[in-house]
UniProtKB/Swiss-Prot annotation:
Identification of the protein by name: Small ribosomal subunit protein uS12
Keyword RNA-binding: yes
Lineage: Bacteria, Pseudomonadati, Pseudomonadota, Gammaproteobacteria, Enterobacterales
Gene: rpsL
A cellular-component GO term for this protein: small ribosomal subunit
Organism whose genome encodes this protein: Yersinia pestis (strain Pestoides F)
GO molecular function: rRNA binding; structural constituent of ribosome; tRNA binding
Length: 124
């Protein structure tokens, strides 16, 4: 335990919080260009072909972003918007692609949870 005199001379230092999404640089989303669109397999015990893409952001970072939903229209040179949010079973994937923004279309025939997949309300 430090004495009061020691604390007067050198106060306690605050812990520095480390960001989980450093490439966003404290922004809610960032724009970027796809450099590679591919599938990858998750960690054990899961099994699938997860759709991901490498993205070169406007601030110069190159990150891997997950493409959620069934089917997508992304290819190399597509301009997309990314947000934070990791994928637990894909190591190194710390960002999500925002569906329905810029070149990334919304999920076709989506009826529920539409706002998460960039789908407009259907006309009755």
């Amino acid at each position: 335990m430090a004495t009061i005199n020691q604390l007067v001379r050198k106060p306690r230092s605050m812990k520095v919080a480390k960001s989980n999404v450093p490439a966003l640089e404290a922004c809610p989303q960032k724009r970027g260009v796809c450099t590679r669109v591919y599938t990858t397999t998750p960690k054990k015990p899961n099994s699938a072909l997860r759709k991901v893409c490498r993205v070169r952001l406007t601030n110069g970072f190159e990150v891997t972003s997950y493409i959620g939903g069934e089917g997508h229209n992304l290819q190399e040179h597509s301009v997309i918007l990314i947000r934070g949010g990791r994928v637990k079973d894909l190591p190194g994937v710390r960002y999500h692609t925002v569906r329905g923004a810029l070149d990334c279309s919304g999920v076709k025939d989506r009826k529920q949870s539409r706002s998460k997949y960039g789908v407009k309300k259907q006309k009755a």
